[in-house]
Amino acid sequence: MYINMKDYGLTGINKTKDTRAIQRALNRGRCKPTTVYIPKGTYDICKPLTIYGNTTLLLDNETILRRCHSGPLLKNGHRFGFYRGYNGHSHIHIKGGKFDMNGVSYPYNNTAMCIGHAEDIQLIGVTIKNVVSGHAIDACGINGLYIKSCSFEGFIDYSGERFYSEAIQLDIQVPGAFPKFGTTDGTITKNVVIEDCYFGPSELPEMGSWNRAIGSHAS
């Protein structure tokens, strides 16, 4: 199934309606392989979006999804969902666009993309920016992670306690490592390729670079 978000009521005018429209399209991935295309524009997101298995999310290179809440922008599971091993929502491909955590206007510690208990996760040509204290990507318990030609721009730690935070965290499903969802069953992250990526500040003067590009807390 191919969905153009223009046909789902996406306007860039009302953040509540836009968030609902994108989530409604992503929900189609529960039933069948789905490609969701988000055209050029800036869309304010008022709650975390959940992406399901066998979904390709295509964004125009001038598309911005801008956080207007305190949580993550995108995750592949629900807080009380039962995920273990690599049996979570998998085969998720994200291509293009900008995911703006909007950390100056919403200065809350969180991670842009939280991906856990899954296989075959791909990000190509994606920009993640303006993160407060957290990670651009938290990949925990993933078998097959491919990140290519992505940009990680802009990090600040208002608390002064998260100097160690990485842009890309590769972790193991152990207690405290991945609090968003899933079981802490020791599932490792493996078969990872990260290539041709940029790590640096964003255009905002407050937003510098992460102190570490790639790392892990649990290991």
Stretch-by-stretch model annotation:
Residues 22, 46, 68-85, 105-114, ...:
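Extracellular beta-strand/beta-solenoid scaffold signature
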Residues 26-32, 50-52, 86-88, 116:
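Flexible, charged surface loops at secondary-structure boundaries
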Residues 60-63, 90-101, 119-130, 143-156, ...:
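Right-handed parallel beta-helix
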